């Protein structure tokens, strides 16, 4: 392309160039699977979609990591997911199938009973097909909305129903600090859970209030200290860039605090405006695309600087 056109692109293109409606690592993954070298795959993203070098390098790292994970899988291995569709409150950005406990507490016990039956059926199916569970993840909702006793019943039945001897990762989304205590965490450890995910989304109290959370940043700090002291092998923290009331400076403070807690996984999402979310329905003001870009730029540099990799 003429030099003038390329100069104009630098001024007008968004951070991921012309990529729209596709995960940025997908074209790179396809290129690698077709036999291109990593450098060729990265250049394909730059030349065909005008993705800048830093984002193209990140997409390449993600693609290589996903292909390594895929190569480690065997044909007789499956992943197991259990969903617990209850939360203390419904977050403003949420569109998942989930209910606030205050409105649906009476449904929790019947749901658990039906779930135990489904676990029995699924375990028999896995056994009949000669399959092995490679990984287990419990999400939601917020699984730790269950009481310690309910969680104990659920995990006892799970471990008795499935052969988890080849399970490489046993992860439960602990989610929100207002649902986590020592007793529940001990139940998770006792049943073999080696990875939990604590999801503050932000450590700015103004942002937590804006998204409908009933806990504070100080609560998250206490929960992380407790979780880290109890010996979980891996602890993940989820953050969202672009939440109402957040700023690039506030997001930087959040990420820096997460790094100081010692979590060995940090997942940074960008806010997606979903049709059923309160943010969209109420027209809440959110950060600009430029501000979100600053949050993501800092995420890349700070996490790489702390030796985190995709």
Regions found by a protein language model. Name each.
Residues 98-299:
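Conserved non-cysteine loop/helix-boundary elements of the Radical SAM core domain that shape
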Residues 77-111:
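Canonical Radical SAM [4Fe-4S] cluster-binding loop centered on the CxxxCxxC motif
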